Each structure stands twice: as C-alpha cells, then as structure tokens.
Amino acid sequence: MSSSVTGEPIPGGESLPFPPTPSGSIAGRTMQESVYSPRPKERRLHDDAPNILIVLIDDAGPGLPSGLGGEVNTPTLDAMLQDGVGYNRFHTTAMCSPTRASLLTGRNHHRVGNGQIAELANDWDGYSGHIPRSSATGPEVLRHYGYSTAAFGKWHNTPAEETTAAGPFDNWPTGLGFEYFYGFLAGEASQYEPNLVRNTTVVLPPKTPEQGYHLSEDLADDAIGWLRRHKAFDADKPFFMYWASGCLHGPHHIMKPWADKYAGKFDDGWDAYRERVFARAKEKGWIPPEAELTDRDPTMAAWDEIPDDEKPFQRRLMEVAAGYAEHCDVQVGRLFDELDRLGYRDDTLILYIWGDNGSSGEGQNGTISELLAQNGIPTTPAQHIAALEELGGLDVLGSPKTDNMYHAGWAWAGSAPYKGMKLLASHLGGTRNPMVVRWPAKVTPDPAPRTHFLHCNDVVPTLYDIVGITPPRTVNGVPQDPVDGASFAQTLVEPGATGESSPSTSRSWAAGRSTTTAGWRPRSGHAHPGRRVRPVASATGARTTTRGSSTTWTRTGPRIGTSPSSTRRSWRNCGNCSRSRPRRTMRSPSAAGCGSSHCIPNSGSRRRTRAGSSPATRSACPSSVLPRWATRTTGSPSTSPRRRIRAECSTHWEATPADSRASSTTATSVTSTTCSS
C-alpha cells in the first residue's frame, strides 16, 4: 500500500475550462501543400486517478447500523468497515439541503446559498437555494479534468419553484456538473410512486407498485446500467458517481417481508434499545470505553409512558423503518457487486456516508401520514390506530396505503449515543454521522475508527488532493469563492496524521446552531417539531410540550486543516491569531497568539464536574471569536425566558493528543460554568 494518496499537482488548472489544444494540421492552397496531424486525445489526469463513488443515506443516525452496534442489518456497510477505514467524528449540518450543498462544493452551506431546505429558499444571502456559479461543485471541476459524472436519487438543492418540467434547468444536477441524472428533485418521495426525472425530462417509473416497484431498487438498477454503458463507451475515463437514496427519509415505505424480519426485535422500546446500542458501540470500539450515555431530553416521552394499547403501533413503525434501511443498504451492495464484476473494485474510492443528518423525529408521536405531523396538524396516536384499522391494520404500515413515519423516540435512539436528532444543529445527534472509506489500491483496512474531526465540506478538497487538482480561480469565467474545507487525504493511510491548526465549521438551522473553532463548540438549541413528543396532562387531554433554548460551549479535539479560516460571516476574527496560526490540542487548548482572552489560559479557574469525575483545568473560552448569537441576550429572564440565550462555557473530560479517541464523542462528562473571560 502507498504511504501517500495525494496526487502530483496537475498544471494549468487555474482557469476552467481548459483552453482547446491547437491543431497541428496546416491547410495549404492545395492538397499537396496541406499537412494533416491527428489531434492528440487530451488527458490531463494521472493514470492512477481513481474512480469516485459517494453513497449518501438520508435521515439516518449512528445508532442504527449493525456494524456500529445498532440492530438494523447493514451487510454492505458492515463489510466496508472490514475492508476500509471508518471515521467516527464526521459531521454534517443537521439538515439535508445544507449538508448536500456543502458536501458537493467543499464550502460552508451558507456561502453556497443553502442555509435551509430548498423549499424555504428566499431572497436573503445564504438562503437563496441556488448554489452560486462562484462556488463550482466538485463534479463540475472533475468533469473539466476528464471525469464522467453522474448523480442518482435525491436532489434537494434546487428551489421548489424551479423543479417543474418548464425549468429553468441551470440549477438542476445537469446544470451543476453532472452529465447524467436520474432521481427526484425534492426532499422526499414516495418509494412506490415517485416523481422521477432523467436529466431534464420528467419520466414515469419503469414498473407499478403492483409489479413490485421500489425506488431504492430502481436507483440501483439505473446506476448499474450507467456503469455498464460507461465501461462500454468510456472505459479509459474515470468516473464520479453520487448515489443519494431517499432512504431513510419519510415516508417509510418497504415491502412487508422486509419489515417482518424485525418482528419482536423492538418490543422493549427506545430507551432499552438505546442502552443496548451504546454498550455494543463501546465493544466494537466505535465510541471510547469511558463514554457516558447522554440522558433523555425532558421533552421526550419515555417508553414506559406510552400506553400499552399504543405500543404495538409504535413497535411496528420501527420494524418498518428497520426493514426500509436494510433494504437500502442491500441495494448499495448490488452497486458494489457491479463494480467488482466490471473490474473497478481496486481503483474505486468509495465514501459511504451514513446519513446527511441524524435520524429524523419529524414523525413526532408516530404517524401514518408524515405530512400531517410536518404541517402541524394536531392528531393523536389513537386516531392513527383507528384509521389503520379501516385500512387493514398494522400490516399496511410501509405499504402504498400509508405515508408512515416512526415516533421521535426511535429517532432519538437511532442517533445514539448523542443528544438530539435531525434539525438540531446544536447537538451531535443532529450532526455526527458515520463515514466509511474504501480504496483497495491505496488504503489498508483498519478496524479501529479514525477519530479526526471532519466536516462534510472536507470531502471535495480531499478529492482534489487525491486527484492532484488545485482549486481553480475561475470557472466558466466566474471568479471562485475560497474552499472552506480541508483535505483529510493523508489520514486514509496515516491514522496519526494531524493538521497544524483548527479551522472553523458551523452548522445552523432555525432549530439550533453550533460552530467549531479553535477546538471549542458553542451551541444554541431550540425546540423543534421532533421534540413535541412528551405527553403532558392538560384540561382538554391534548398532548402539549415545553419549549426552551440554551447555549453552551463544548471542548472538541483538534481538527485537520491548514488555516484557521472561519466559515460564519458573523465571526469576529483575530488577525494576529490567523497570521500566527497557533496550534491547539486537547492538552493545550490555548496557544500563544494575539493576547486576547481566547489565547490566554485561565488556569486559576476550575470547572465543576459530575459526581465521580475528576476536575480539569479550564481554559478561557474563545470569547473574542464568539459568533454574535452566542453572546447576545434578548430580554430579561423574567419577561422573555424563551428568547434568552445564555453564553456559557463547558469542556469535555481532559484528554491528551495521544489519546484522540477520548475526544471522539461528547457523550461523556460535560458541565457548564459561566465564562469569566
């Protein structure tokens, strides 16, 4: 195996597309005076440039896959864990459109106009829903260098009003670097009757539900067909494929035999499931042995609080979801098998990302129609159960008759061991997703997970680094924005590889936000639809919930990178620190720099700890680089408690750089104390 996976820089890529190669032919006055010289076939890529396949699962947390301690069978992901390397501190944005835009461009999601989902696109900077031409996608750049590019499945990066058959098409996949697309332009789709598009043409599914159609199978079939055509017509060109299934997003649609495989497996509920997953994740080494399981949120219903006559409904919803997830992973396996059959296995770099955010609690109390929950239409589980009886009972869950989605308690369990879930950018349950990388030609399998702090905007710069591409200054005449991510290529072959500094990343959405800079993570969490799940007695008997918000600082480990650039425009950057590039680690969270509070250790203060844990010296929080939302207070606690944002500091247990696995999860002793800096 190679000790390096980075490619030699390819010259001449500052401006794309490349200028045409002049012809060597000369047209004279006569045939005898003319000279014909065949134009050489252009190849700018190195001979060992790999094929690239990115698999992105939807709305799936780390507490589900069997290979990571979960109870959902994922044979393909499990095999990749044996054949590749896993990353247990890879981060998303807690929301689908932002994660996908960041993943495909290598930039912060606000920089590329995707601060929220495409359906909520508006005229505000950062929220337009348009990936700007000043931030060319990775596939667009790779295409100019000679890659064939194709995308399959969910495309959630086009404003809804631009997704009709009338176009415009410049913000569709084929306008953003992909030569071929087959899938749907939305956040979700029926798995039995999806609205499909091939390139820019609306098409019907090849089969009906009665004939056995399922979207995940169709996407695998079409991708396999594309691979075969590529092998036949462009065998000398490497390919970039983006395969983004709509699973595990609602509605949870799967054929009954797949759901029946899990009958009885979840009878003891989400609390017990979460504890089992946590214990097995430790056994498998995915989380550190000293980690502590985070508590259930006060707004989340305990399984014991669910009425006995409602529990069969809640169990079956999870059985259906588990069958749905396994079925999708099996389709990914079919795609991998075709790569092997075509001889692509060794030279294909695969990134299997399990979730664009954490598991989704948008089903709230469990529903037979997820849109009822998402649109705030009040219902009770009893009403859903009564409707199911008219449709045929629990067995119709997962069928075309329902658009079911499980209780948020299952989403919380599926995001174990972390707190939160999808939409909660303030907590790791919304933003920390497993990633497994396989590249047989270059990467030696390693059963121990990599613990480097990574973000989805690191993927594109990593691919550039491997191929030998320098980010272009202009693309199609448009000056390019800087790439925010940093390459983690060398960590594929060197488990101990580290960067020199801690660049910033941010994750934010209306339901919460967090950012990471200089090894700190301030976060602000708010109530969201997935948390309206705890039954509270009221005069009418209706279920209500409590709301609130909080902001805390959490210490994180060092992040791979080359420069401490911020990705939030609200940062107040310290120029001297940026110039001196101080190194920060878990042992030395502060370093010589500008002399401001975030560069001065506050060794005289000690943080409070949970009972049984040892105190650790706390360094001053980086207050001079606090985002404005982490420092402001609106209203007084007595007059507007829901609007008050507390600026606090908190740290993890103390860890050393040599034991980076100790910082691989925040599911350990974390306490808060008011910042003194």
Where are these regions (language model features)?
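Formylglycine-dependent sulfatase
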Residues: 1-544, 548, 557-576, 588-590, ...
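Cytosolic coiled-coil signaling helices that couple upstream sensory modules
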Residues: 551-552
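Polyanion-binding and phosphate-handling cores
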Residues: 577-584
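Substrate/cofactor-recognition hotspot
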Residues: 589-601
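Glycan-recognition/cleft segments
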Residues: 649-672
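Carbohydrate-binding surfaces in secreted/extracellular proteins
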Residues: 677
